[in-house]
Structure formats: C-alpha cells, structure tokens
Amino acid sequence: MKSHYPPLDVTQLRAGYQKGRDVVKGISLQALAGSVTTLIGPNGCGKSTLLKSMSKVLAPSEGSVSVNGESIHHLTATEAARLVSMLPQHPVAPEGLQVGELVARGRHPWRRRFGGLSKTDQQAVARACTETNIAHLVDRSVDSLSGGQRQRVWLAMILAQDTPVILLDEPTTFLDPANAIAMLQLIRRQAEAGKIVVMVLHDLTLASQYSDSIFIMKAGEVISEGRPKEAFTPDVLAHAYGLHAEVWDDPTSSGPVIVPRGLSESSEGINLKPLS
C-alpha cells in the first residue's frame, strides 16, 4: 500500500568538501513516496555528494533539502535519523560485531535512553532480517561473511531503522547479477510499501528497469531527468559518458535496455593509470 507521505524536495542545492569549491552545483529534484529515484552519471560527477547532502551527513553550502516544508538540516540528529536512513558506499563494521548486533543498530534513533531493545525494536530487527534473508546469519560475525552477504546485512540495518526516506549509495556493490536483481527487487518493495527511495547506481540497464525516475549527472549538474524512457537517449549517454550506445525499447518492462557499442566520436576516452 502506497503512502501519502510528502515528497523529499531538493532545491537549488550546492555542496562540496572545501569552501568555494562545490561538487554539486545548484541541483533541484523531487523524490516521491512510493517510487524509486536513481542518480546515475560518470565517476566523480557528484552523485555520492548529492546523496550525502540529502541527509545530515554533509551540510549544503546553499539550497535546501526538505520534507513537508521542513529542512532536514534544521532537525536534530535524532529527528533526522527517524526521517532519513542512508547506506553509504563502503560501510565498515567494528571487528567481531555480530550480524544481529549490527542490524539492531538501526534502531538507535528509536531506542530509550537506557535499557535494551523494546518489543517494537525486536520486531523491527526480526522483520528486517527476514526480509533480507539473513535470519540464519544473525549469530555470525559480520567480518566472516562474503561481500554479498554483508551488503544484505547493511540493508537490513537500514530497513530496521524504519524511516520514510531511504538513501542508498550503490546498493548492488559486491553482488553477482542474480543477487543484484534480488537486492533491487527488495528495494522496489520498499517503494511499493510507500517509502521514498533514492539510490545511486552505475549499471544503466538495471537503473532503467528498477527506477521510476532517473537523474543523470555530469560535473555536478543534472543533464537529463525523467522516466527511464525519457532520460536515457543516445545523445545524453554520449554527453554524460562519452559513450556510443543504442537504447532499445523493452516490451516486458517500462524501462529501455542500453547497449554500449563503444566510445562516441566526441569522447576523449578514459586515461587509465598503468599497473605498477
């Protein structure tokens, strides 16, 4: 059942890591409840910086991120953590931490100041473990798991946090194709349950198949946006990536299939460093 939760509004956002050197340059977007919004673009274009700025991880230099007219950056840390959860690109768990303990950390914004997990907390943790198919791993240490298992554990922690807004930076990292699709199907179910989901992906076809809205970035700016069939065009892919690609309609889904054919004629190519 879809929620009537207000959208997440990003307005003329500028953000970076050094004063006067913005990585994100005046971006505006709206992410709706019940939908998956995906940010894509070449390495270094500002996707992760934008995602961090949509939580309290990174304060913008200008602009706003708001829900129902209230700026996320004006909330307390606890208030923001009850509204927005974020899975960064390379999360690190303390050595020896058990899976169940890590997932339970998602309940931190909701826990009483003193005492253990409440019944509501325990139910949220159990539900998240079941949904991500890691219930059989709860007594294992996180560092004993494969990369794909760890990624599902981190997502379980985010789901246990039970926020209306979920931000995911490359959630299919370390996953083989079958597990990547399973992960994206799980993410889609969060949107179908009424959540606002914003994620960063690199796989163009997966982004097309599992997103409701696409924002394609280059050099800190959005150069194309809309539903996948609208956002992905050969000209846009050439501009964003220097890529010659064909965009095919997929009669079985709402998103197109992107078929790379090489570098575009205008591309300067990618300079790779020699291996030492």
What are the roles of these predicted feature ranges?
Residues I166-E170:
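Catalytic Walker B motif of ABC-type/P-loop ATPase nucleotide-binding domains
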Residues S55:
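Helix-to-loop junction immediately C-terminal to a conserved catalytic motif
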